[in-house]
Every structure is written in C-alpha cells, then in structure tokens.
Amino acid sequence: KTLTSPKIGTNILDTNGNELINLTATGSSVNEITLANAATGNAPTITASGETNVSLNLVPKGTGTLQGGGSAIKIAGKETIWIPSSAMYPATTNGAAAEQVETTATRPDMKVLDFDASTDQFAQFSIAMPKSWNEGTLTYQVYWTPASTNTGDCIFGLQAVACADSDTIDVVYGTAVTVTDAGIGTVEDQQISSESGAVTVAGSPAAGEQTYFQLYRDANAGGDTFSANARVLGVKIFFTTDAANDA
C-alpha cells in the first residue's frame, strides 16, 4: 500500500528518540527509491524507481567512503597506470639511451633511459587506455635517478595522441606539458617529480583507441640546469574514469 496519509515528516527516530533516517522532500519529484524485503535465501533490495533510466546516488560525508561488507567499494574516479622504462623505447630520432645500471652486485639493477644534459632526447610508449577512461586530460609523474651529485633543475615533458581503428599513426603529438624536478644531490637516489599539469591527448580520444605518448627531456631550455644524464626509471600516468569497470 502507498502511504499518503498520514504523511511522514522530515525524519524517522529510533526507539531512543535519536535520528535514524532524515528525509528531504523535493518539489514535484518523480524519482524515488523502492525498498523490498526478501524471502529465505534472497537479498533485500534498494531500487531506484520513477523514470525509465534513474541512477542511484549514495553520498558519503566528508572523507567517508561507500562500503560493502565493511570494505570500501571501488567507484569511478582518479586511477593510475605505471609505465616502467623497460616498456618504453628510444625514439628513432634523438632517442634517449636504454641502459641497465648495476648499483651493487645482487642489489636492484636499474633499467633506465638516459636523457642527455645538452640535447633534447625522446622516448615513446603506448597504452590502449581502459574503456572506463573518461577521455579527458591526463597528468603524470616522472620517476628517475640522477647520474651525478648536481642539484640543478631537470625539465621533463610529455605529449600524447590517440588513434582509432583505421586512423593513420603518422600523426603529430599533442601539446607537451612539462614538469621540473631538482637533482637530489646523491647518485642512485630515487627521485619522484611532482604531478604535472593537465595533458590534453590529441586526436579524438574514444573507448578502445590506442594512445601514443612521447616523453622527453627539455635539455635545451634555459631552466634545465641539471648537468648530467637524467636516468628515467618510469612514468606514472593519472587518468579519470567515469564507469565502475570496462564492461
């Protein structure tokens, strides 16, 4: 039976008189939720109802999270992809040098791309971006290690372009976005740049397309004062999703 009278007020209280559920009315509303109990072996349901297609918006407070079974529920939002230097390749023209550098025997070897201090050099990689990506801008961080104790600034840049089925791959990259990180002063120390500004992917990014990336060191820029090779260990790409999965 639909309860029309008496009308429920703005809240429902528990047996102690404390608020259990707060209710907010919307003028001329057409969408609502339906609560259904269930027989043995079945789960009760909370269903959005009203118009033909209605989302269900559950909003936690402050830094709270949506939970299921006591654990946070994964929702659409900011995600990361890690690209190690071993998954990149030096550009045919002015390519960075792919190297394997030993620290101490039986300790971690470093798979790196060496970017020169005096010449702009490039490396490339590609990703078939997840279907859940919102096709918006990206950001990135560079993970690297210095080849000297110099503490000058090192400038890295990243640019990208998306290609669909039957598109030519002989296409110009999008506008580069740079990030600057100062040498830490100790050889073989781990360095992680700050997160870059927004990188716009050229082309017409869409689900299922392959995105090509070009990473470079802007060694010829006046602001790049790091006087040795910058040894890139990898790049972390940040992207935003607008779907819970890639179905």
Specify the residue positions occupied by each region the protein language model found.
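Beta-strand-rich, repetitive solenoid scaffolds
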Residues: 2-6, 10-16, 20-51, 55-61, ...
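Short carbohydrate-recognition loop motifs
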Residues: 103-118
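Short beta-strands within extracellular/lumenal beta-sheet-rich domains
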Residues: 116-132, 137
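A short beta-strand element within beta-rich, extracytoplasmic domains
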Residues: 136-146, 154
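Short coil-to-beta strand junction motifs in C2/discoidin
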Residues: 150-157, 228-232
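Extracellular carbohydrate recognition and processing domains
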Residues: 168-203
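Cysteine-clustered segments with highest specificity for TGF-beta superfamily mature ligands
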Residues: 191-222
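Proprotein-processing/basic-patch segments
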Residues: 217-247
